[in-house]
C-alpha cells in the first residue's frame, strides 16, 4: 500500500474518530428524559458542544421586539444601527444569566429583533426580563418649596396628569422649575427630583439578590465600579441630609435619606418578590437597553408539536435515505455500495460539525441537510457514470477510476460552487430560519465534496491494492 493511500485513510479515520467523539455527548444528552434534561439545564450542567434543537423542534416561544429608536438621543442611521446591536448583546446577556442557553437572537430589518426561547418553561418571566429597559438613575430629591407645592396641587387636581410613557403632560411640566422633573413613585404618588443625573446603572460593577430587606422582602444590593464609586461618593458626600431617589425605568423605587458619604456599595429595597428581585439583579448586571423595547409579536409552540415535527422530519429523512441507498446499490452494484458508505459518513461528519459549532437544528436546517445529501449523491452519480463510460471504452481498471474522477470533477465543482454562492446570499440577507438552512447547506456541501470525491477515491485506491480484475458498476 502506497504512502498516499495511507495518508488518505489516516485523514478519514481521524475525521471519523473526531465525529464519534463529538456526537457521543449528543447521544447521551438526548438519551435522557425531558425531565432530566430540564434539571441539568436549570443547574447549569448542560453540555456545551451539543446539537441544539430549535424552536420548531423543541417547542417554546418566539418574540419579535421593536426598539423605540425615537427615544435615542441621537436618531441618526449610524446611532440606530449601534443601538440595535447593543440591544441584541444586552438581551443575550440577560437571557444567558436567566439560564436559557443558546438562544437564537437575530436582527430583523432596521429596528426589530427576533428572539427565540426554545424549551423555556415560563415564557412570561423571560418576556418581562427582555422588555425591561433597566435604566437605573440616582437623583437628589428636591427640597419642598412653595412653587413645588403649587405644582403638586395642580398635578393632584388633574385627572390624567401622565402620558402613555409615564411622563408628565406638557401643560403641567411647564409649571416646574428648569432644573426639576417629577416622576411616579412605585408605592403611589410622585416625587420632585433634580433633572441632572450624575450617577447611572452604567457605573455599576455587580448586582445580586439578598433576603432580609425591609419587612423581610428581598432586596437588590449593588457594587459600583472604581469610577462609579468616585461619582457616587461625590454625589452623596455633597448632599448629606437630603433624600437620594433610586429611579428604575422612570419610577422612583425608594428615596432614603443620605446619612453619610457612600462610595462602593448600596441597595435597592421595595416590595419585590423573589422573581422580581432576581430579574432586576440580572438586568442591572447585563446593563440598560439603549432605548425601550416592546413585544409586537409573540408565537408559542407546544412541546408536543415540536416532538411531532422531530418524528415527522426524522421519519421522512430516514425513508428518503434508505430508498436512495437501495437504489444506488441495485443500479450501480459495488460502485453504489461505495457511494452509500460515503453518504453515511457524510451524514455523520455533518452532524458532528454542527455539534462542534454548537449549532441549532431546525426544520429548515433539516431541509438543508437533505439537500446537501442529494448534492452528494449527484456527485457520486456523475463519477459512476463517467467510470461506466470509460469502462465501455475498454480502459483498464485504474484508468477507468482515474478518468472517471477527472472528467466528473468540473461538473461537481460547478454545481457545488453555484450552490455555495446561493447559500452565501441566503445567509447574508435571510432571516433566522433561512440562515439556518444556509448554514447547514454550506457545511453539507463542503462535507459532501469531501466524502463524494476524497473518501470514495480512497476506498477505490484501497481496493486497487488487492489487484481486483473488475469492479461492478
Curated annotation (Swiss-Prot):
Official protein name in the record: Protein translocase subunit SecD
Taxonomic path: Bacteria, Pseudomonadati, Elusimicrobiota, Elusimicrobia, Elusimicrobiales
HAMAP family: SecD_B
Bilayer topology term: Multi-pass membrane protein
Pfam families (alphabetical): Sec_GG, SecD_1st, SecD_SecF_C, SecDF_P1_head
PANTHER family cross-referenced by the UniProt entry: PROTEIN TRANSLOCASE SUBUNIT SECD (PTHR30081:SF1), PROTEIN-EXPORT MEMBRANE PROTEIN SEC (PTHR30081)
UniProt subunit comment: Forms a complex with SecF. Part of the essential Sec protein translocation apparatus which comprises SecA, SecYEG and auxiliary proteins SecDF. Other proteins may also be involved.
Compartment(s) of residence: Cell inner membrane
GO terms, biological process: intracellular protein transmembrane transport; protein targeting; protein transport by the Sec complex
Record key words, sorted: Cell inner membrane, Cell membrane, Membrane, Protein transport, Translocation, Transmembrane, Transmembrane helix, Transport
Protein's organism: Elusimicrobium minutum (strain Pei191)
Transmembrane segments: 5-25, 316-336, 337-357, 364-384, 409-429, 436-456
GO molecular function: protein-transporting ATPase activity
InterPro entries for this protein: Acrflvin-R (IPR001036), SecD (IPR005791), SecD/SecF_arch_bac (IPR022813), SecD/SecF_CS (IPR022646), SecD_1st (IPR048631), SecD_SecF_C (IPR048634), SecD_SecF_C_bact (IPR055344), SecDF_P1_head (IPR054384)
GO cellular component terms listed in the entry, alphabetical order: plasma membrane
Family assignment from sequence similarity: Belongs to the SecD/SecF family. SecD subfamily.
Function: Part of the Sec protein translocase complex. Interacts with the SecYEG preprotein conducting channel. SecDF uses the proton motive force (PMF) to complete protein translocation after the ATP-dependent function of SecA.
Top-level lineage group: Bacteria
Main localization (coarse): membrane
Amino acid at each position: 500500500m502506497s504512502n498516499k493511500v495511507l495518508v488518505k485513510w489516516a485523514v478519514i479515520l481521524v475525521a471519523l474518530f473526531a465525529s464519534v467523539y463529538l456526537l457521543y455527548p449528543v447521544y447521551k444528552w438526548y438519551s435522557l428524559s425531558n425531565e432530566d434534561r430540564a434539571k441539568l439545564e436549570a443547574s447549569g450542567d448542560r453540555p456545551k458542544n451539543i446539537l441544539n434543537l430549535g424552536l420548531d423542534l423543541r417547542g417554546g416561544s418566539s418574540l419579535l421586539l421593536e426598539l423605540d429608536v425615537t427615544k435615542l438621543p441621537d436618531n441618526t442611521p449610524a446611532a440606530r444601527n449601534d443601538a440595535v446591536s447593543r440591544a441584541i448583546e444586552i438581551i443575550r446577556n440577560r437571557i444567558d444569566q436567566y439560564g436559557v442557553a443558546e438562544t437564537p437572537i437575530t436582527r430583523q430589518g432596521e429596528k426589530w429583533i427576533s428572539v427565540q426561547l426554545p424549551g423555556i418553561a415560563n415564557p412570561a418571566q423571560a418576556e418581562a426580563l427582555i422588555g425591561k429597559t433597566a435604566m437605573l438613575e440616582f437623583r437628589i430629591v428636591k427640597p419642598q418649596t412653595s412653587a413645588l407645592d403649587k405644582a403638586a396641587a395642580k398635578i393632584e387636581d388633574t385627572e390624567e396628569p401622565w402620558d402613555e410613557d409615564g411622563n408628565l403632560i406638557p401643560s403641567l411640566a411647564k409649571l416646574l422649575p428648569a432644573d426639576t422633573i417629577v416622576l411616579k413613585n412605585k408605592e403611589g404618588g410622585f416625587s420632585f427630583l433634580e433633572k441632572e443625573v450624575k450617577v447611572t446603572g452604567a457605573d455599576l460593577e455587580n448586582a445580586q439578590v439578598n433576603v432580609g430587606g425591609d419587612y423581610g422582602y428581598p432586596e437588590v444590593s449593588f457594587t459600583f465600579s472604581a469610577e462609579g464609586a468616585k461619582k457616587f461618593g461625590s454625589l452623596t458626600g455633597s448632599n448629606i441630609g437630603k433624600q437620594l431617589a433610586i429611579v428604575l425605568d422612570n419610577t422612583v423605587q425608594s428615596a432614603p435619606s443620605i446619612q453619610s458619604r457612600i462610595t462602593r456599595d448600596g441597595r435597592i429595597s421595595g416590595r419585590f418578590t423573589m422573581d422580581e428581585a432576581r430579574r432586576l439583579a440580572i438586568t442591572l448586571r447585563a446593563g440598560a437597553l439603549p432605548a425601550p423595547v416592546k413585544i409586537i409579536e409573540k408565537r408559542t409552540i407546544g412541546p408536543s408539536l415540536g416532538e411531532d415535527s422531530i418524528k415527522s422530519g426524522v421519519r421522512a429523512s430516514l425513508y428518503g435515505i434508505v430508498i436512495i441507498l437501495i437504489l444506488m446499490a441495485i443500479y450501480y452494484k459495488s460502485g453504489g455500495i461505495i457511494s452509500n458508505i460515503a453518504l453515511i459518513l457524510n451524514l455523520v461528519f455533518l452532524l458532528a460539525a454542527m455539534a462542534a459549532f454548537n449549532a441549532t437544528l431546525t426544520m429548515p436546517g433539516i431541509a438543508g441537510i437533505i439537500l446537501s445529501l442529494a448534492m452528494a449523491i449527484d456527485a457520486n452519480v456523475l463519477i459512476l457514470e463517467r467510470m461506466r463510460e470509460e469502462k465501455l471504452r475498454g480502459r483498464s481498471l485504474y484508468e477507468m477510476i482515474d478518468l472517471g474522477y477527472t472528467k466528473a470533477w468540473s461538473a461537481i465543482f460547478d454545481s457545488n460552487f453555484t450552490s455555495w454562492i446561493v447559500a452565501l446570499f441566503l445567509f447574508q440577507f435571510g432571516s433566522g430560519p433561512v440562515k439556518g438552512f444556509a448554514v447547514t447547506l454550506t457545511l453539507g456541501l463542503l462535507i459532501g465534496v469531501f466524502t463524494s470525491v476524497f473518501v470514495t477515491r480512497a476506498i477505490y485506491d484501497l481496493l486497487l491494492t488487492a489487484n481486483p480484475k473488475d469492479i461492478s458498476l
